[in-house]
Amino acid sequence: MQNTLADLKLIIIDEVSLISADLLYQIDRSLKTIFKRSQTPFGGIGIMFVGDLLQIPPVNGKYIFMPPYNSQYLVAFENYGLWNLFEAWILKHNHRQGEGGEWANCLNRIRMGIVTEEDLKCLQSRETDDPIHDLESMHLCYTNKEVQSHNSKMLSKVKGPLVQVEAIKKYPKGRKPRIKDDGRLEDLGVMDILQMKVGARVVMVVNVDTIDDLVNGATGTIVGIEYDSKNVVECVIVSFDKEGTGEIHKMQNPKYANKYKHVNGVPISREELEPMLKSKAGNNLGIGSKATIYQIPLVIFYACTNHKIQV
């Protein structure tokens, strides 16, 4: 590992709000072990975090700047506190919201702990006594399991036949796929068994082509499902919400692009993915332990977690 990373100088980690205090010290310990520099923070490797520390804390963890849960890291925290080694550079213009209007201004004040009377009225105007379970409403949930439950409920309301696509899984001898409570495979985001219908809302969970905007988080609606000569699902046709998404992809797949031109459909096929296999102790396995998964990188999207929606 040290030879592989011999030229490593800097690690950039995005979404700092998802990094717990314990994970910060795990990163420190791992780099010290790899580079055999036990007395130098992060083994002498530069670390740059990017993100928003005013977002909600990591799942089952503390904010990165707080004392870690694990007692083995507390000594290090009390002695030198890794977070104190960082220098903050604050970006002051919110490009995602743009000028944004009063709603964006309201959200920006709330994130700073400032709530005006008008802000409160704005939020309360969106309050409802009964849960909304129509196909146009997005629900925010705390866990992925709750998300999967709500997505399944909403999918059942979509008219038309249910189609299932099971992932093709190739694993080393003696290894089995790790399927999470919400039906996703490993840490890849894709479903072991993807259930869908024409007309269902979906979101991409893998970066297929960043130039073509076919990226993790791209949302749309299924407008068609195409099969091969063996009646196996070949691709899913998606009309994406963002104009221009998948234009290059359509040119590379003219067969279905022309057929679904009237709905701006983009064909999405199975992607080849490689999960990071780990030992029982949680360590990454080395050469000879490669696994491959082939699955359509979409999931039903009527709900998502609080953490997912804020990034």
Predicted regions mapped to residue ranges:
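Conserved ATP-binding/catalytic motifs of P-loop helicase motor domains
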Residues: 1-310
